[in-house]
Amino acid sequence: MVMVDALNLGRRLRVRSTAYVAGEPVPFFWPMRTFIHHNPLYGLEHMPFEQAVRRGAELFHARMFLPRSDYQRWQREGKVRQDTLAEEIARRAQALPAVPGIDWPRWLQALMQSAHDRDVVVPGVRAPDVHAALHGQPPSAQAVDVAVLLPALEQRLHGLTLPEAVDALWGTRLADELDELVIKSYLDFFDEDQSSWRMPGRERGLFAAWSEIARRNARMFLRGLHVRRTLGRVQDPESAVVHVMEEMGIDPDAWSAYFTRELTRLHGWTGFVRWRSSAKHYYWAQRYPAEVVDLLAVRLVVGLALLQESARHRRTPVRREQLDALLHERGAECLLRNALHSGEVLPDWAQRIDDTLSRGGSKRCEALLQRYWPLWQARQGQDQAAALRELAAAADATAALEVLSPEDIAGLIQGLQEFARQEGMVWTLAMEAQAIDQLLAQVQVPQDLAAGKRPFAQAWFCIDVRAEPIRRHLERVGDYQTFGIAGFFGVPVGFLGYGKGSESHFCPAVVTPKNLVLELPAELDPEEDDLLSTLGHVLHDLKSSVLSPYVTVEAVGMLFGLDLFGKTLAPLGYSRWRNRIDADKPVTRLLVDKLTREQADSIIRTLQRAMIVKALHAELHIERERVDDDMIRELRETALRHREGPTRLQRTFGVSDKQEAEFIDKLREVYRVDADYASYQLVRLGRIGYSLDEQVNYVHTALTMIGLTKTFSRFVLIVGHSGQTENNPYESALDCGACGGASGLVNARVLAQMANKTAVRERLRGMGIDIPDDTWFLPALHNTTTDAIELSDLVLLPPRHLVYLDRLRNGLRAASRLAAAERMPKLLPQARAIEPAQAWRLAHRLAVDWAQVRPEWGLSKNVYGIIGRRSLSERADLQGRPFLMSYDWRCDPKGRLLENLLAAAVVVGQWINLEHFFSTVDNARLGSGSKAYHNVAGRFGVMTGSLSDLRTGLPAQTVMREGQPYHEPMRMIALIEAPLDFAGRALQSVVKVKSLVLGGWIRAIVIDPTQGYKPFVFNNGQWEERPPLVAPAEEEHAA
């Protein structure tokens, strides 16, 4: 067997870079436990939106807009702006070919009101055949010219991979078989301890580990897939890619496009590998590396083996030039094959074509094609003529249609075909126009608080759309002022929870926190030795087991049995019972401050002493009670090279010089009692907590960002959020996206603790922000599934605030019940007239029902992003549709805060918005289908059934109801309250957002307070002026 020449470094890098670029249209896919919303067309955001959706449809074989009937339903409900529909039709009609007697706007209006969802243009139809059918004439009797028909088929086949091309002509399933085979290998390699079997050699990388298994894979060998032959000739994924592409005869200039086609067939797996290879801190990626070129190499090697097997059994092509030769030498046969296997063959001809192909022979195929093709073209013409007659009747243009020449009909078909690619965009623009009108009709001129007026409480919520209803109800049940801010509250937190063995990140997925916060029992005093000992154990490298060794398998089984019956028969009562049983976690506090050098040194000494005691027991079988502190101190000093000579270990226990020396060496090398490792531990300890400067900066930024720099309430609630659901792989999608798909409570606790510090407030006072002594920042958690708000860290609440606690809780509970009463009818249409208390109980039951596939709607129906003061929209009922970002341009003279909001919150909001958009328009390809068929894959994703692509989008239950779209797919409408020039500069400064606005990925509105609160809507590349906002009624303002 001849080994392929090793690739030089330059060629290897070229292959890797080509594979990397080919995968760029596929967006990252994060593991499900930290579900991150993403735009499925993120890799195409450099294109204008309308152009990108066309390209996305090609790449992902997906639909980009909904069927016509869904938009018509919304039109009947008043959700489509009629004049925008007419304007867009008229504008686009101007670009269509002029056809005598055809009034394009009337025809297109009729098309958009058609009762059918099917395409109006029949693929491949010929205008003369349509003309003949319209006039009841037979098609012209011309001989079929294979040379004329072949270019279209050749172009189509060249856009496919070779396995797909073979499938198109022979009706095989090579491409599907390839997907199934590689998915099995991907599952084995990427498994994160879900499977009981471990693929050996994974630390060497995907291609290397897979190669070793594939060489000995009996299933592949019995199938006749000789991957061993190919693998014996290559050394690495790059050489495998080169070898296979050369074996298939693919022109090097076409490699990138071919790679993209391969990688987008399983875009979920590709997106996961793209993210994984870039995640420097992801444990599984560091331990078992894999890159896009590995993924591609595995696909190509297996694909070549499938082609070779098919060639042996069916004499199908393996090389591109063989396919081209087949097309030119046996063109009639190829046309018949494509007709038979495309699903468009005339029903009564399928058997005859199949028989002829089985018998073979160019003359037979040519003769059959001459008989079949005119009949097929006639049927095409008849179908197209029927569709045009129906459309002409709806446009009141039947007479105009009947007098068209074949050339005119060709122009008509061309125009209809071009508009068919634009129709979904026209509907979307008209829906967005209506949504913009509805928004501008509800927002009002914002008003500041009356001088000297102090709200009872102020509450910060995440910008998440699910916070809008509860904020609205909270403001209406009492004297509450609310604000919106990204749910990590601007503080990236690395967190080590009480009893946890690993660090979690509570911040946006693209951020890596520098600081680590520890959660400790509240009774520990920061100055006590117990705290230092606890920290020593926290920083120790050894991992503790998940289950105590004293918990028996039988006990676990019994508990699961109780779960099974309890969650099924009485979910709400059982959940309360389990919570009482599990309530063993003590009251905790967070270590937010930096350690002093003395504390850090003391922690390291504590840890070293513990390691010495452990080593004495493990290496010399000496128990702790037999040694005193002086002996441990002496051993520690010796291991750190602070002293030399024998220790008391020799005199007390009769240890020889050699044994003592070996023991000291083990202390240094195995138990890490040495100076270098102590320095490393100091660095690790340096991550704990935040310096005073950092704390002041985080609190100051948060306060100025939301415009809260004066008139502080007695209570300032910092409300994180999370969802609650049982038996749901998408659980993290209901949590806070700004916290990396986790709960926002930790960040709320951290910022509250910072803001309550006297030293921080003193610094802020010097910066012009005077927080009264009686103001207390109180963390809380908003459960978006139940609408409950639970206060946290109440043990730290000053005694003088306790008298107001009942009033605070009563207000929160009332708002929560009203929010539940608003939300339950949307979730369960049968609960239309429901009392708040009943809705509250129902929401809690759904949250703990493990059979519930939709415990809440999540962020469905999101459409607005409002950046401005809350009083701009607080009188509006926006029905849980806006991301509400508090911002006061008067506190931002340089525009830096607005730029930060645009670069972070608006971009993330656009990701969320477009994930809902595309998951709705094609839930099978860009969403994830029904949850009912989902299975967890490797603990990092979900698949449909036992074998499929990784499902990357949102499940049907999140965006659909009873088979119809619940979410209304529109691009995010971002409204900014700021002077037009000021907002324009910020938009220009944030390059990404500038590109998104100019490219039509975001719809932008600016409300200019310096021009009488006039709205300016960005449309078709320019700002369009709208009438000024109205001021609130005097009685409302007084209230």
From Swiss-Prot:
One GO CC annotation: plasma membrane
State the source organism's domain of life. Answer: Bacteria
The record lists Zn(2+) as bound by C462, D464, H721, C736
The protein's required cofactor(s) are namely:
Zn(2+)
Quote the InterPro entries the UniProt record gives.
Answer: DabA
Q: How does it sit in the membrane?
A: Peripheral membrane protein
One GO MF annotation is: zinc ion binding
- Which keywords has UniProt assigned to this entry? Cell inner membrane, Cell membrane, Membrane, Metal-binding, Plasmid, Transport, Zinc
Localization in the cell: Cell inner membrane
Question: Pfam families annotated for this entry?
Answer: DabA
In which family does this protein belong, per the annotation?
Belongs to the inorganic carbon transporter (TC 9.A.2) DabA family.
Read off the HAMAP family from this record. Answer: DabA (MF_01871)
Instruction: Summarize subunit and interaction data from the UniProt record for this chain.
Output: Forms a complex with DabB.
**What role does this protein play?**
Part of an energy-coupled inorganic carbon pump.
What is the name attached to this protein's record? Probable inorganic carbon transporter subunit DabA 1
Primary gene name: dabA1
